UniProtKB/Swiss-Prot annotation:
Pfam families: Cons_hypoth95. The keyword Cell membrane does not apply. The keyword Cytoplasm does not apply. GO terms for molecular function: 16S rRNA (guanine(966)-N(2))-methyltransferase activity; nucleic acid binding. PROSITE patterns: N6_MTASE. Belongs to the methyltransferase superfamily. RsmD family. It catalyses: guanosine(966) in 16S rRNA + S-adenosyl-L-methionine = N(2)-methylguanosine(966) in 16S rRNA + S-adenosyl-L-homocysteine + H(+). It comes from the Bacteria. The gene is rsmD. Keywords: Methyltransferase, rRNA processing, S-adenosyl-L-methionine, Transferase. This is Ribosomal RNA small subunit methyltransferase D. CDD domains: AdoMet_MTases (cd02440). It is an enzyme of class 2 (transferase). Specifically methylates the guanine in position 966 of 16S rRNA in the assembled 30S particle.
Amino acid sequence: MKILKKKSKITSIQIISGKYKNSRIPIINTKNLRPTTNYIRETLFNWISNEKIKKSHCLDCFSGSGALGIEAVSRYALSSTCIEIQKKAIFFLKKILIKLSITNVHVIRANTIQWLKKPNKSYDIIFLDPPFKTTLLKQTIALLIKNNWLKNNALIYIEQENTLNKLITPPNNWILKKEKKTKKIHYSLYMNVNNF
């Protein structure tokens, strides 16, 4: 008997504002892929001034669908670098970039932790939304600091599970700018201040 493989369910979310407003981004239903909701993305980008975004090179450390990186360039960020390890997620991300003729989103298939061990350049805005119930967030923050991935006054967005006594404690020189929470998710925006 032939065993049929279960196909990944594909849904989509939309770009909220800017150059690619209302464009749909495909989302595959696969392990550890948990795209930031439209509501949370809208809140996040309302926290960041348009002037800041337009001058920024962004890094999305656990890109998944690429929604955060694409939203940033839609709002005229200079560039976004998206790091993702899952092959299917990369396939659909590259497909939407081609469809929308986006050339300033750079997609890298890599293990984020390993990639951050090799310093490359500093970024203005960093998105951190790793899979829940892992130590990835803690490891990523340590590497961002150790290897100077953050420019002075860089903004760091963190999305984590809203679990009592398990929220990450940020570095002393990261100033909390904004935070909100839902029943399951705690999300916050920090500023890196090197001369703190």
